[in-house]
């Protein structure tokens, strides 16, 4: 009995222990080679699976979110703020757009400083206005642009004009035709001419508004008049 106890004490002190036989474990080479399927079918502990899954993920790396999973705050920040223009600003912008559709950087900067707007906003307004103008031009709803000269010559609606306004066609009727032949005083007796002849101004803008309608008499050439008899002059002189 002393022999086995001494042997066990020596095994405990050396740290070497035999495998217990009741567990059914055998560490021989034959047993290991004969049972490969049994080793594969053994369930792995859950702790090992968790460690393997942790090792596959790189520490410190974050997966990128798809665009649809982005927060709403980021989408709101990306939206552009719409600019509200005042009436004076729109008038200045439309006036320059009527003059040119493609202003350069210097003109845009001057206009932006005058109407208190950023130059980028002015550029965006011109881009949108050009697109709107092209769309209206294609649809056929675009009205003919007014020339700057016509805008300056147009009379205001509240202007009080005394007398009839002479149109260009009416002005041409006042100017005597150049092909008319003037009757000289030597061809007619002196009694046919009054003492004072009112002079008609030659400039249309010097004419005063006439009370009645304008009538144009045809000019009769001098060769259509028959020669005057000497007695006719004496008759006209006695009648006057």
From Swiss-Prot:
Residues 78-137 bind DNA. Residues 36-82 are annotated as: Disordered. The keyword Ubl conjugation does not apply. Expressed in intestinal epithelial cells from the duodenum to the proximal colon. Keywords: Activator, DNA-binding, Homeobox, Nucleus, Transcription, Transcription regulation. One of its GO terms (biological process) is regulation of transcription by RNA polymerase II. It is found in: Nucleus. GO terms for cellular component: nucleus. Coiled coil: none annotated. Residues 62-76 have a biased composition (Basic and acidic residues). Pfam families: Homeodomain (PF00046). Disruption phenotype: Mice appear healthy for at least 1 year and display normal histological features in the gut. They however show defects in intestinal gene expression with a dysregulation of the scavenger receptor Scarb1. One of its GO terms (molecular function) is sequence-specific DNA binding. Transcription factor that regulates gene expression in intestine. May participate in vitamin A metabolism most likely by regulating BCO1 expression in the intestine. This is Intestine-specific homeobox. It comes from Mus musculus (Mouse). The gene is Isx.
